[in-house]
């Protein structure tokens, strides 16, 4: 991959949840908005957990440590929803209720 290609790769700089949507601001000035329901762990999280995120790899991905959730920016741009199976999500959700 050339250095010019790396400069054009999308990177996040800010993340927020508002009105049932995940909003990711990119360093190039774009903002991505997707339904929060695309990511069930985020949809079922408390507002505090939703705000507790860190950028990985200089902004190429977002990690929510309280939720064990990772979202890559390229996947978000491609319209990829959570790839977690229903069974895995149900196990995670039942573990939170204990």
Predicted features and spans:
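Motif-centric detector for short Cys/His coordination patterns
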Residues: 1-98
